[in-house]
From Swiss-Prot:
Pfam families: GeBP-like_DBD. This is Probable transcription factor At3g04930. Residues 15-38, 50-62 have a biased composition (Acidic residues). Belongs to the GeBP family. Keywords: Phosphoprotein, Transcription, Transcription regulation. The keyword Transcription regulation applies. InterPro entries: GEBP, GeBP-like_DBD. The keyword Ribonucleoprotein does not apply. It comes from the Eukaryota. One of its GO terms (biological process) is regulation of DNA-templated transcription. The modification Phosphoserine is found at residue 16. Residues 1-71 are annotated as: Disordered.
Length: 456
């Protein structure tokens, strides 16, 4: 029994592996594990993942002095073959460049997948910026066709509302009217600004014409714009919200001299004494001769009135009623709907101005005669009291001539004084009748204006 038990124990010891001989017993390691551990180029599958991530040179800073000064390129990614199965330690693919030790060539790692952040920055730099919406504001809003349509609509609006009331028309109704005709998106301020610019453009052309310069239109559109603008702003009256005080008034531009050729593209100014054909306020064409000195400068209303008065013939008492009748016939010819203000003003100027002038001349001569400054008589007699002053052209309120015949204080002088007195009475009666006609015409016109409907 003892021998059999001993033999069994001995056989068991022979079959069990000896731990000193490298066998695996009770959780010991085999020779294969030791060989794999001694190999530096092989990664054990049982190693800690955190240690593998710390040893991964891809996570290190490439610009650090510790890595840039290494003579040997460390392995970025390695593949270990354990039990015939490849295992990758890095999830990101990369290109590994290895150089021998002691090489001074700089090392660069080129990643296969580029950084998306760098990709986005490159797109922002090289992408063409979009067109800014603010630049579209400076694009032209009104085309040539729109300008013509706008001026025509404004001309119709002014023609319809001119003379309908004492107040000037407003631009608000016109904005509502023209907005439906134009295929544009504009507001009232843009409309008023466009009309103001067109008016200023027209005034600039008229100022060049008044200064004697030749005006050439660049295109047929400019010519058409000027012709329509002349029909609009060549009339009196202003528009609410459309006043422009920086330009000349109608009176300064209505009498501008302009002679046009067939296509109205050139305005020439004659050099001396041009004969102008103008439309007066009552619609009657008149020919007026003006000196060249008044052509080269702008004229105010008083200047124009003075030129017209100087160029008119002297109206004698005999032709006064005839002139008044002519004016009345002209007013009847053009109709009551015309502008009667100019007719009344012209009638008063034709009738009253000579009366005032004659009275002023007569008063001056009487004052000079009273002061002893009259001219001596033709027959001698230096201070003979019968001298006639500077009012000799006007016999009103003047003393009779002393021709030197007879003796002062004789009967001939008394007869001459009586004849002059009768002549003065006749002249004053003529002027009185003329003034009565003017007053009657003014009353008639006033009654017609009061009874006239406002829509005409």
């Amino acid at each position: 029994m003892t021998s059999d038990h001993r033999d069994a124990l001995f056989s068991l010891e022979l079959e069990s592996p000896d731990p000193d001989e490298g066998g695996v017993a009770d959780g010991g390691e085999s020779d294969t594990d030791e060989d794999l551990r001694d190999n530096d180029d092989v990664v054990m599958p049982g190693t800690n993942e955190a240690e593998a991530e710390d040893d991964d040179p891809e996570e290190e800073d490439l610009n650090s002095p510790s890595t840039s000064s290494l003579p040997m390129v460390s392995t970025i990614s390695a593949t270990a073959v354990v039990s015939g199965t490849p295992t990758a330690t890095s999830s990101t693919g990369a290109v590994t460049v290895a150089l021998p030790a002691g090489s001074a060539v700089p090392v660069s790692v080129i990643p296969v997948d580029s950084d998306p952040k760098w990709h986005r920055m490159t797109e922002i730099v090289h992408q063409r910026p979009p067109i800014d919406d603010s630049r579209r504001l400076f694009q032209r809003l009104w085309t040539d066709e729109d300008e013509i349509e706008l001026l025509r609509g404004f001309l119709d609006y002014m023609t319809m509302h001119r003379g309908s009331s004492s107040h000037p028309p407003d631009t608000a109704p016109f904005y509502e009217q023209i907005k439906s005709k134009l295929q544009l998106d504009f507001n009232k301020n843009q409309l008023v600004e466009k009309l103001r610019r067109l008016k200023k453009k027209y005034r600039n052309v008229m100022s060049k014409i008044s200064s004697g310069k030749e005006v050439f239109f660049k295109s047929p559109h400019d010519q058409s714009t000027f012709e329509i603008s002349r029909k609009i702003w060549n009339q009196t009256g202003k528009i609410i919200g459309f006043e422009d005080n920086n330009v000349m008034d109608f009176e300064e531009t209505n009498n501008h001299h302009n002679t046009t050729n067939g296509n109205y593209s050139t305005f020439n100014s004659p050099s001396s004494n041009p004969t102008l054909e103008l439309d007066s306020e009552n619609g009657i064409e008149k020919k007026l001769t003006m000196s060249s000195s008044s052509v080269s400068r702008k004229r105010s209303r008083s200047r124009i009135g003075k030129i017209e008065e100087d160029n008119k013939p002297v109206i004698t008492p005999s032709d006064g009623p005839i002139a008044s009748n002519v004016n009345l016939n002209e007013a009847a010819a053009v109709g009551i709907g015309g502008n009667l203000g100019g007719l009344i003003e012209e009638t008063v100027k034709n009738c009253v101005s000579p009366v005032i002038k004659e009275m002023m001349n007569g008063t001056t001569s009487m004052m000079m005669a009273a002061m002893g400054g009259g001219f001596p008589g033709l027959g001698g007699g230096g201070g003979g009291g019968g001298g006639h002053g500077f009012g000799s052209l006007s016999p009103m309120f003047t003393r009779p001539f002393n021709f030197g015949f007879g003796v002062e204080g004789g009967g001939n002088k008394a007869v001459a004084d009586e004849r002059w007195r009768k002549q003065q009475i006749l002249e004053l009666e003529v002027y009185s009748r003329r003034l009565e006609l003017v007053q009657e015409q003014i009353r008639t016109t006033l009654n017609e204006l009061k009874t006239m409907p406002s829509g005409i």
